[in-house]
Regions:
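A short glycine-threonine-serine/GTX helix/turn-capping micro-motif
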Residues: 148-159, 207
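Short acidic-hydrophobic, aromatic-tinged amphipathic segments that line or gate anion-handling sites
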Residues: 32-39, 139-141
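NAD(P)-binding Rossmann-fold cofactor-contacting core
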Residues: 4-27
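NAD(P)-dependent Rossmann-like dehydrogenase/reductase catalytic/cofactor-binding core
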Residues: 187, 191-253
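Internal alpha-helical scaffold of NAD(P)-dependent oxidoreductase catalytic cores
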Residues: 85-95, 111-149, 160-199, 245
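Small-residue helix-packing motif on alpha-helices
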Residues: 23, 57, 96, 178-186, ...
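Rossmann-like NAD(P)(H) cofactor-binding subdomain of soluble oxidoreductases
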Residues: 20-24, 29-30, 38-114
Length: 253
């Protein structure tokens, strides 16, 4: 998406990737990328991107330091590793940008939360914001600590909605519909509801337009909105559990 949608058509992408399946997937996109199985010695670039598992970063940083890799700016897509820790492991004081995207970047509908360190230059910030803007909607965050909450909301968020769809579809099937019809009812309902939200932008009003006093929807909503066992309590517990885990990951690294 970057290569196809970016104004910077002349950018050179150099990628360290050990997994053959991932390399072949990128090659099928018919874009020019230079691949490496190991970090080259005295590698040079304007921007170095880190998209590795957080627990692997120490090892990667050590290899970069040993190979005297030169870069002007750092962009991290790793959860839980702060800008100060990134600088510490890489033994540098250069600017660091942290980005928390989510799965929907695969269809250019991602939610990208971006934090730039205080020494990031405006031109670079605009360039990175523009680059990630190709993949979806950007939200610039001034407080780095909020990135752990971002991970719990938009980072993990798609999985919550996938689970809801899965459960809703299963219940429809339990009620007697075929799997095909159950899926159609589920996906069609969600798709239509999302379009209505885009038009109205007031979920409480939309809920009121579906429900009526002593009706079927109200009966369901009474269960979903119970104070101590309803959807709000379940979702709050789930999101806070994800945030707690994100916080613990940041302390491990």
């Amino acid at each position: 998406s970057w290569k196809k949608g970016s104004r910077h058509k002349s950018i050179d992408i150099h990628l360290v990737e050990k997994t053959e399946a991932n390399i072949n997937k990128i090659k099928k996109e018919n874009i020019k990328v230079s691949f490496y199985k190991k970090i080259p010695k005295k590698w040079e670039g304007d921007v170095i991107f880190f998209a590795v598992k957080p627990q692997d970063f120490k090892k990667v940083a050590k290899e970069i330091n040993l190979n005297n890799v030169f870069y002007k700016n750092i962009v991290s897509i790793m959860a839980g590793i702060t800008t100060s820790k990134i600088r510490s492991y890489l033994k540098t004081q250069t600017s660091v940008t942290r980005v928390m995207p989510n799965l929907a970047v695969e269809v250019n509908l991602g939610v990208n939360c971006i934090f730039h360190s205080s020494n990031s230059k405006n031109l670079f910030k605009k360039s990175i914001n523009s680059l990630f803007g190709i993949l979806g909607n950007n939200y610039e965050i001034k407080d780095e600590k909020l990135l752990e909450s971002v991970t719990a909301i938009s980072g993990s968020g798609p999985a919550y909605f996938f689970l809801f769809l899965n459960v809703f579809e299963k219940i429809a099937h339990d009620l007697g519909f075929s799997k095909k019809v159950a899926r159609g009812l589920t996906y069609g309902t969600v798709e239509g509801a999302l379009e209505l939200v885009k038009m109205e932008n007031n979920t409480r009003k939309l809920i009121g337009s579906v429900s009526s006093k002593k009706g079927t929807t109200e009966a369901a909503l009474k269960i979903l909105e119970k104070k101590n066992t309803g959807l709000y309590k379940i979702m709050k517990d789930a999101v806070y559990a994800a945030k707690k885990r994100a916080n613990s990951l940041s302390k491990l690294n």
